[in-house]
Amino acid sequence: MVVKPDDKVFPGYFEPGKLKYWTLEHRLLNHRVRIALEEKGGQGWLNGDRGEFIARYPGVRHRPDGIITLDNGAIVAVETERSMKTRARYINIINSHLAASDAGRWHYAMYVMPDDKTKTSLIRLFDSIKTVMRNNVPVPFDTKNREMFLFRTIDELEQAAASGGQ
């Protein structure tokens, strides 16, 4: 869970024995993404693993790692990817993001990866997807449907934050 001291909800307790290395690495990447986006003027970070997310976005099938509103007003679902999932899993996640976009819940889904290799692999996997569901109808996964998906490495995001660029 990505938290800051002034967050309204703060975890009640911590059990070190239940924290796995992989989970720690994922949460640290989430922290870096949140900090980089907030340095660019983003605000209102909401963790996807909190009850507040479920209350604010009922019916969303896939919960992203976080939601943030950028300084231009765009609402972005943040997905941090340390390793690749199956193609079928990404299709389900894409369908959920498209449905959330159609419902006006967020405008973009930003995938942030630790390195160029993972970024390139994910872009190639997305390129291999030809059909997705939009409004319960199979549609081509063309430029129009792909434009809401952004791909960045954490270094790209942090460098953009440091330079004030997008």
Question: What are the functions of these language-model segments?
Answer:
Residues 2, 9-13, 67, 75-77, ...:
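Ordered hydrophobic segments in well-structured contexts
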Residues 28-31, 91-97:
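Well-ordered, non-membrane alpha-helical segments in soluble/globular domains
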Residues 84, 88-92, 101-108, 113-166:
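Non-catalytic C-terminal interaction segments of nucleic acid-processing enzymes
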Residues 1-29:
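Interdomain/boundary linker segments immediately adjacent to catalytic/signaling cores
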Residues 1-6, 47-49, 150-153:
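Helix N-cap / beta->alpha transition motif
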Residues 33-41, 97-101, 126-130:
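Hydrophobic, Leu/Ile/Phe/Ala-enriched alpha-helical segments that form helix-helix packing faces
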